[in-house]
């Protein structure tokens, strides 16, 4: 099936589409299912009486909440619906073919076994696997000293060895948004994030509202989380696939996954064309009469923040990477391990990609310095004394200044499109790029992808222009000025008249009568995505306005702070147009402004710059308009609506305005909700990865419902978490998650500078999508948050996020290596230092006095002076000043010379 045919099928059946409401119909009625209630110290659970699969899993502390879809148990009662307690097996005899068995496909009566002692329920479920199963499968629910455990014993009942090449345990949790309001979803549904870390792997199940308790699914011995396989919807799966579920998957329901213990047989078949798996696929063999027991344990953490402490309390190995698991080759990283078993060895896969050097321990944690070579994915495999192995997944990148340069060069050359005969006004343009085809995408039936608007079409030029905020390049700036003047103004954006400043949905559209012969006849142009010229010209989608506002605002900042770079217009023109875009949004696209918008933080910066420039009338009007939105959100319990049924893109802007207007309780709720879908996990792919699973439909080449790794939500949701950390530097977890998301957005950039929309995490893909798509929304988030952080943690000691740290003679210094080198937070001082011109080479902090010395790069043609702003962000922090420095527009203007210069900041 081609990508476009698959796209047609998916877009026709997806539950929620941009701008569309969920289709609702009368609910059918179902017969109730008999259940057996069970109590353990931590849970109130229920098993289906007929199958002994899990029908309810409520924490004892809150019995009205259910981690599994118990409310839908009756409608999910038939054959083909998987539950916790089911099993998937693929086996073969020596030299034979693989055969699949699934306990949920055609259920048969189970044979109950005696439940004595700590056993809560037991059954032989072999009959549900079918008559040809070479294995006897017994399942037991156990109360193991107060911990709920699920165990399967597999016994080879034949006279020949049996190889188990695939073994999966369905993990069915209530992540379903369908037919629920936002309030109901936040109260009733949960998210699941995996740590695919072999013997140290686990699942964390967190409630949408961010409150505790959280659920952890932990492996028993011999039950590694080797892979995390999506259980596909039966109606759409390949013929013969029985490892499926009949529940619909779509934007309102991600679906369920297998805890995959063995995956070799999948790797040989379904995953044969995929990229490298998280772990080497394995199988195991049972001799005649031999048995093996596998199992998982269910425990609760009192809060999401207490997950790591709960892992330690349950004798699980815990890894903490600083600053995370994305390691540029010029940065030092650290790995802290707290483990019940001594470390036997640490290996790099591939060999030499990572080195982990033991350092002095940190209050019960083993510490390693981690350095990287090369580029791309790598793993540290940590073997413990008992033979168990923990996998920590890393991503190695170029030094970030090189990555920034690569992105700017690629987007303004390989993605640059000029054609005076282009019938859609895309001349010049920066268009979506197809990495597989090696060319820009001039037509796609999802017309916005080729139309420079919507996220899927604006992403590439937004990335190119956002890169200039801290790393302006004269050649790139010259092209971007043309892009704004010749294409954005007048084509994408209405230039004058009653709708001046309004933004169209797409420049590209479908009109075969007007453009005969233009459209690819092999593509289906009959779905709703192939907008007419009228629909493409609609001004009512507010989500498109921040993209254009970013373009104007960045060029304002460059023109204001880097003399001679921007020549098309004075700085005031760009700031005026950023303001005009904002007010046009409120006038021409008011409906969606009731929601937080992706990249909506740009409006806060525009307002602040209007104030700094003394443009009082404009600032007053913009503040009035934004306060209307904020006051509306303040009345809602969960003000995170979207054009989707649930989304992770509106929260950052909601948080920003709550903070701006002093609505701290609402800001706190927003932060808590973000932490429900934005985890810290020892994997570059999941650490700081804001949950998203549907946007490949709208911005990717391969349109699938699939967990996306480092879609633009990762970096955008890092923005509020960074702010929250700077307000409370005692909460290291906030910084770890934020930095994971911010750096996650760099992994999308390949060695040439191409930037992918997101990584396909499903094991049959495991590679970056070939379309650049909506990546630029995330790169904007990286551009405004790129910074270095210096802190002294009570457990881990002095740490640097984004920079290398040295200590000497009572002083601590950090050499920033982040992608901007224009922002620095000194946590012990609570001081946030930002530069709008110039670069920070080094900062030295003297804890005894609080003095901070900045070493600034020498002058360049575009940076003859540095523009330095300082802000104390904590309640206990003291204000800082730079004596003798000239103050201009709220910051210090510091002349730069031919050699690096120093600026001393002192607390008052």
PLM segments and residue spans:
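Short, hydrophobic/aromatic beta-strand segments
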Residues: 158-168, 306-309, 344-347, 865-868
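Bacterial N-terminal signal peptides
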Residues: 6-15
């Amino acid at each position: 099936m081609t990508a476009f045919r698959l796209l047609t099928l998916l877009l026709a059946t997806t539950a929620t589409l941009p701008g569309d409401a969920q289709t609702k119909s009368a609910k059918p009625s179902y017969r109730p299912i008999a259940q057996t209630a069970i109590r353990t110290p931590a849970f109130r659970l229920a098993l289906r009486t007929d199958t002994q699969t899990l029908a309810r899993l409520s924490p004892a502390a809150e019995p009205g909440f259910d981690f599994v879809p118990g409310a839908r148990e009756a409608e999910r009662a038939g054959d083909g619906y998987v539950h916790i307690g089911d099993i998937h097996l693929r086996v073969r005899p020596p030299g034979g073919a693989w055969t699949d068995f699934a306990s949920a496909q055609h259920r048969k009566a189970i044979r109950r076994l005696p439940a004595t002692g700590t056993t809560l329920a037991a059954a032989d479920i072999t009959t549900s696997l079918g008559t040809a199963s070479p294995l006897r499968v017994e399942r037991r629910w156990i109360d193991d000293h107060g911990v709920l455990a699920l165990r399967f014993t597999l016994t080879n009942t034949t006279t020949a060895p049996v190889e188990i090449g695939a073994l999966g345990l369905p993990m069915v949790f209530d992540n379903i948004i369908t037919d629920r309001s936002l309030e109901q979803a936040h109260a009733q549904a949960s998210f699941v994030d995996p740590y695919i870390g072999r013997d140290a792997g686990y699942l964390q199940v967190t409630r949408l509202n961010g409150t505790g308790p959280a659920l952890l699914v932990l492996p028993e011995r011999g039950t590694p989380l080797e892979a995390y396989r999506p259980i596909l919807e039966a109606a759409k799966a390949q013929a013969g696939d029985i490892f499926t579920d009949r529940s619909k998957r779509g934007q309102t329901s991600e679906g369920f996954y297998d805890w995959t213990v063995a995956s070799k047989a999948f790797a040989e078949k379904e995953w044969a064309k995929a990229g490298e798996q998280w772990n080497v696929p394995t199988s195991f063999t049972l001799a005649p009469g031999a048995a093996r027991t596998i199992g998982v344990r269910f425990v609760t953490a009192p809060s999401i923040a207490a997950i790591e402490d709960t892992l330690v309390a349950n004798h699980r190995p815990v890894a903490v990477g600083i600053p995370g698991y994305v390691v540029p080759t010029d940065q030092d990283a650290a790995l802290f391990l707290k483990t019940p078993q001594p470390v036997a060895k640490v290996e790099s896969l591939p060999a030499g990609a990572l080195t982990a050097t033991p350092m002095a321990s940190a209050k019960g944690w083993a510490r390693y310095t981690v350095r990287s070579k090369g580029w791309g994915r790598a793993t540290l495999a940590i073997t413990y004394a008992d033979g168990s192995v923990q996998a920590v997944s890393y991503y190695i990148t170029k030094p970030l200044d090189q990555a920034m340069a690569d992105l700017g060069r690629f987007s303004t050359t390989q993605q640059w499109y000029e054609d005076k005969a282009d019938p859609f006004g895309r001349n010049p343009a920066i268009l979506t790029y197809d990495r597989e085809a090696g060319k820009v995408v001039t037509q796609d039936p999802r017309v916005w992808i080729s139309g420079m608007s919507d996220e899927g079409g604006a992403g590439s030029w937004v990335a190119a222009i956002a890169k200039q905020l801290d790393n302006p390049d004269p050649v790139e700036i010259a092209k971007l000025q043309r892009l704004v003047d010749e294409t954005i103004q007048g084509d994408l954006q209405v230039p004058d008249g009653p709708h001046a400043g309004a933004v169209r949905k797409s420049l590209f559209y479908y009109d075969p009568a007007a453009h005969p012969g233009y459209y690819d006849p092999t593509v289906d142009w009959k779905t709703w995505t192939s907008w007419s010229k009228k629909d493409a010209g609609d001004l009512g989608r507010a989500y498109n306005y921040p993209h254009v506002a970013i373009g104007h605002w960045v060029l304002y900042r460059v023109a204001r702070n880097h003399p001679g770079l921007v020549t098309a217009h004075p700085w005031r023109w760009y700031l005026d147009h950023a303001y005009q875009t904002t007010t046009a949004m409120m006038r021409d696209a008011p409906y969606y402004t009731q929601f937080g918008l992706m990249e909506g933080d740009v409006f806060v910066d525009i307002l602040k710059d209007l104030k700094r420039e003394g443009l009082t009338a404009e600032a007053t009007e913009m503040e009035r308009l934004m306060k209307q939105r904020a006051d509306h959100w303040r009345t809602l319990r969960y003000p995170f609506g979207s054009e989707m049924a649930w989304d992770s893109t509106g929260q950052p802007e909601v948080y920003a305005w709550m903070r701006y207007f002093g609505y701290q309780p609402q800001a706190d709720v927003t932060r808590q909700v973000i932490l429900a879908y934005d985890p810290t996990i020892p994997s570059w792919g999941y650490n700081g990865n804001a949950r998203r699973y549907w946007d490949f439909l709208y911005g990717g080449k391969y349109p699938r419902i699939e967990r996306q790794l480092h879609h633009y939500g990762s970096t955008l949701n890092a923005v509020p978490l960074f702010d929250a950390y700077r307000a409370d530097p005692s909460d290291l977890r906030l910084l770890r998650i934020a930095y994971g998301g911010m750096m996650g957005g760099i992994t999308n950039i390949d060695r040439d500078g191409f930037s992918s929309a997101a990584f396909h995490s499903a094991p049959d893909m495991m590679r970056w999508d070939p379309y650049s798509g909506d990546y630029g929304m995330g790169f904007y988030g990286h551009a405004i948050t790129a910074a270095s952080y210096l802190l002294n943690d009570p457990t881990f000691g002095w740490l640097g996020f984004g920079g290398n740290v040295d200590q000497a003679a009572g002083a601590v210094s950090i050499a920033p290596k982040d992608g901007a080198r224009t922002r620095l937070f000194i946590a012990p001082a609570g001081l946030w230092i930002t530069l709008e011109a110039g670069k920070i080479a080094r900062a030295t902090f003297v804890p005894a006095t609080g003095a901070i010395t900045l070493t600034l790069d020498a002058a360049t043609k575009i940076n003859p002076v540095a523009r330095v702003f300082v802000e104390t962000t904590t309640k206990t922090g003291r204000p800082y000043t730079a004596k003798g420095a000239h103050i201009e527009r709220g910051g210090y203007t510091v002349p730069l010379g031919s050699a690096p210069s120093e600026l001393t900041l002192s607390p008052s």
